[in-house]
Amino acid sequence: MFEAVEEVLREYADLERRLADPAVHADPRTARTLGRRYAQLGPIVEAYRRWKALDADVAAAHELAAADPAFRAEIPALEAEREAVAERLRSLLAPADPNDGKDVIMQIKAGEGGEESALFAGDLLRMYLRYAERRGWKTEILDATESDLGGYKDVTVAIRADGSEGAWSRLKFEGGVHRVQRVPVTESQGRIHTSAVGVLVMPEAEEVDVQIDPNDLRIDVFRSSGPGGQSVNTTDSAVRITHLPTGIVVSCQNEKSQLQNKETALRILRSRLLALAQEEAEAQAAAQRRSQVRTVDRSERIRTYNFPENRISDHRVNYKAYNLDQVLDGDLDGVIQALVDADAAARLAAAEQDPTRPVLSRQR
């Protein structure tokens, strides 16, 4: 009856044992992965233990009430609390996204709207950097192509979370087309323009996740360029890698060293290949990634940022708030939590259609 929970309890105990071994902490990456998984399972274990205790309390109350009716008054409150904990446990046991513990690579790309779109791409980058800063996460700009007015035609950033919650679990919903409505700095008559920026979010892949055959790669080198296309380096330090089987192309020119640019490009390529493999393997992942940017068109929007009204609207969950200035300063938890809750509800509904799901009724 509790097979799924028993598996969690066994894994939790095994992780507890492994994390107590000093040898594990000699490898920081392994220790971090195990610690994150241990923290993820903790709420399930805690809820299950609480449910078991309440189940025993309800049984004891029934036995006492049989001998003394005065104890009957305690039963409804105990049963209500037991059901509330059971509902939480059902939610925790709903199928989880296997990538939730991973870090993120995010690409922000200007679309329709010219220089104004590039400027808003810069605004989005700062928004995500501030959000990461608020949560104590680490960020790293992997590659960037600036526009003439200080925006970004294209920028790629890595975001790494600490603790049990991976950056993917919060930022995976940011993939798609973001539309901005405001008066551009280049607009002399005060007219409101609409521009679009595309955001692509990928779980960061490790080398063990994706094996790349060097024979499948074409590597080209070229000189780095800045705004307006001018050369900013006298050596061929920029790197472009083409993955021949898929046609995926990744360029990197952020570092002064060709070797560093190559390593960064491979890092991005691994994440793109992992995302592609999951898209092809899982219908759910495919549906999710189809909602992300394919062509940066103003009609394929997931979110609108309306400056005149100080309004942010997420069109997937009918979320609307009038705190755009705070959102752009990194206060994203309101809209992200609305998306997390909607996703959890959808996963729970799917799990409830599964006849093999654990049934949390009182043991007799």
Swiss-Prot record:
One of its GO terms (molecular function) is translation release factor activity, codon specific. Keywords: Cytoplasm, Methylation, Protein biosynthesis. Methylated by PrmC. Methylation increases the termination efficiency of RF1. It is found in: Cytoplasm. The keyword Cytoplasm applies. The modification N5-methylglutamine is found at residue 230. PROSITE patterns: RF_PROK_I. Peptide chain release factor 1 directs the termination of translation in response to the peptide chain termination codons UAG and UAA. PANTHER family: LD18447P. This is Peptide chain release factor 1.
